[in-house]
Amino acid sequence: HEIHDQPVVVEAKEHQEDKIKQIKIPEKGRPVNEVVSEMMNEVYRYRGDANHPRFFSFVPGPASSVSWLGDIMTSAYNIHAGGSKLAPMVNCIEQEVLKWLAKQVGFTENPGGVFVSGGSMANITALTAARDNTLTDINLHLGTAYISDQTHSSVAKGLRIIGITDSRIRRIPTNS
């Protein structure tokens, strides 16, 4: 079937969710092909298809065949790119791509930066850098963030994670 002919979202019925909720912790393992089949038929088919041409909503980053292959390779090799000693070539590629991106936007030749898993982690990383550049352990409790009422929810969550409490987050109303 063509993707255009498929629904954008396939919703699960309550009885299908109830079936999952009734599953008990198994006492022994099951054959992999049985588990994969169950996942394909009873879990993965009920979803919003971000690759669908009529999908216009939350943007989780739809998978392409190339990104899928990249995920498989990354999982298979379990590379931790947290430092040049653990994965020197992956770390080198990351640094070179950061240089390419920096050059495209007119930044310095030796930028700092890291790749992260998505927008929420990017927000936490940026908020942490801003906090650490501005506050010390002594005055952390004074840190206050100003965000608009249109700011993505991951920013307020990130602020809480890095120690800026709700009472120190100021939401500014927007009018246009």
Language-model-detected regions and their locations in the chain:
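N-terminal entrance/gating region of PLP-dependent enzymes' catalytic architecture
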Residues: H1-N110
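PLP-dependent aminotransferase-class I/II
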Residues: S117-S120, N139-S176
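Arginine residue identity/basic-tract feature
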Residues: R30, R45-R47, R54, R131, ...
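Conserved beta-loop-alpha segment that forms the PLP phosphate-binding cup at the N-terminus of a helix
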Residues: E94, L98-K99, N110-N139, V155-L159
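Alpha-helix boundary/interfacial micro-motifs
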Residues: P88, T134-T136, D166-S167
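Glycine- and acidic
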Residues: Y77-K85, F107-V114, L140-L142, S167-P173
